């Protein structure tokens, strides 16, 4: 009678070793989930070892079962057959040195047998294999992203200078040399830009085609020198790569190549950094480590590896970045302080360049600490854990340090690769909507958003019909509660057409500085609020007319003259108020807003690339309606409104008892006016503009007279062989000549602004 013993555990990948007198040792792999039932058919002796944790093992009288260290060893005599039964159905014969057959029943499916090796997949293994196949497909479609690999079918960025240049070896030269290198680049760029706008620099006359060609050449030169200067300037170039409102399209096209097409640094250096940071050799830590990087960015590069059976990627930081940032940011602060003095622009916005610099410097220093990036990644993933269309790679904290970041390998296709997305079979229109919705969630709901959303940091795979994959969380933005509340209040003010509420919200956010007289600002806000709905209706009507015209086979867009006329009409209505705003400069531009505006400008460009009819306002409309419903139904909002109303009523009740005093004060003011003791100051904007222009002209004329006198004096001295004083006189003459040139430009700007304000431009 047979006796049996059993034990429960989970069955992993066992190895079966057959040793017999008739054949050498052969290793066969079996993956099952079930019951092992050996039968004793004596033919020759062999040993059977299953390296696994057994679910249940049964034995006959003549078979010994030993369970030790997750291994089951069965010794006995077999007549060429064994039977493995489980919770499924799979049967296959085994051909090999072991003469017999095996029946394998598992809760999966039998895949194959080769020379006595049988593989049975469980549901978990099958799911894992399918996921690997899916990832491999995404890799094959998006393989062009590894632009720096030697592939003749891919278009690579042409960089004539040595990528990495001296900044990769900056410890070998001094801070002074680096500073001279930076300012040499700045001076060259200013001179080249100035020269490209001068007629005498064009052979055969200046034409628009020649100017475009010159801008393309200069833009390529700018990109190559930014690459040569290194990570700090690459980051700045990335910031401007989407600002089509500042730079011509030729510059934007070249700077966009800085977004993720940055040359990698030597892999040997990356390998040494990984081993130093993780405290061991890559052979001991990883099952596999790919020597060649799969991507490179301004601050580091990415290598694939296999860790404990899982595919991972390692983000390795470029060496010596902090010392390089210390040098570069000192020079950039000088530039920011200069811009703080020469700005504001004529739009009335006085940008706080020093604050923007401080914010950027803080972000750069945070980006070179990968532990902070890992924390940002986990916070971001937690915010979107309930959304199926957003994926964030998981972090392996045990293998993450300030210079090495280890995370889950999640392949994807860049969101601006239209042909690859079509080949993947995802809905591009839906992807554009998802991108905007995800950012609205980040800003309005969480107040924590990805501040660098260029196409290199947003990818797509085919999960759930198209899923957004976010990478690189080193550059994140946070919106404080008062700014978020101010944004909502401004939105409600626009909806209710209440200029006072809009201005109050702008003051709360720090965008508007309350000056002594906000009358011009209020009138301008009221004008835009009143015309907002009319302009939206006109735009909708214009779109309908254009669509109808296209259906009939012709299109009649507005001519350039008609657009200019509409612009003149708008300026004529509020021109004086805009000029007063420009003079008072009540607006400020918080540093956080630069990242928000940049993010939505990037998303708008991405969306229009995915869908020609992309309209960001249509996507944001449901969120606006939801905010309005919350405004109407939210308990907290109702309580807040009641509190505000109570404060206003309390103030009104208090003022009721002060009316007599105010009437008395008004009578005193009128009496002083009648007696001539009170001066009334009236602001005449036309006179102010005229005086400013006259002052500029007078200064220019004075500089011209001084330059003329000095050039005569220097010439006389030189002719009389008095060379040293002549040289000094020529130098001072050059200074006054430069002042004359600046004065002429300033007078021209005054004239242009006058024409723009009066609508005669």
UniProtKB/Swiss-Prot annotation:
Q: Which residues form the Protein kinase domain?
A: 288-648
Tissues in which the protein is found: Mostly expressed in leaves and flowers, and, to a lower extent, in stems, siliques and roots.
Membrane topology note: Single-pass membrane protein
Quick one: a GO cellular component term? chloroplast envelope
Swiss-Prot/TrEMBL induction comment: By cadmium ions Cd(2+). Progressively repressed in senescent leaves. Levels follow a circadian rhythm, with lower levels during the night. Down-regulated in response to iron deprivation.
Record-annotated active site:
452 (proton acceptor)
Pfam families, per this entry? ABC1
Tell me where in or outside the cell this protein is found: Plastid, Chloroplast envelope; Plastid, Chloroplast membrane
- Organelle targeting peptide span: 1-57
Q: What happens when the gene is disrupted?
A: Increased sensitivity toward oxidative stress (e.g. hydrogen peroxide H(2)O(2)), high light and cadmium ions Cd(2+). Higher superoxide dismutase activities in chloroplast and disturbed expression of genes involved in the antioxidant pathway. Pale green plants. The pale green double mutant atsia1 atosa1 accumulates ferritin and superoxides, exhibits an increased nonphotochemical quenching (NPQ), and have a reduced tolerance to reactive oxygen species (ROS).
Could you tell me what this protein does?
Answer: Involved in resistance to oxidative stress (e.g. hydrogen peroxide H(2)O(2)), high light and heavy metals (e.g. cadmium ions Cd(2+)). Influences responses to reactive oxygen species (ROS) production. Together with SIA1, regulates iron distribution within the chloroplast and mediates the oxidative stress response. Together with ABC1K7, influences chloroplast lipid synthesis/accumulation and modulates chloroplast membrane composition in response to stress.
Indicate the family of this protein. Belongs to the protein kinase superfamily. ADCK protein kinase family.
Q: What is this protein called?
A: Protein ACTIVITY OF BC1 COMPLEX KINASE 8, chloroplastic
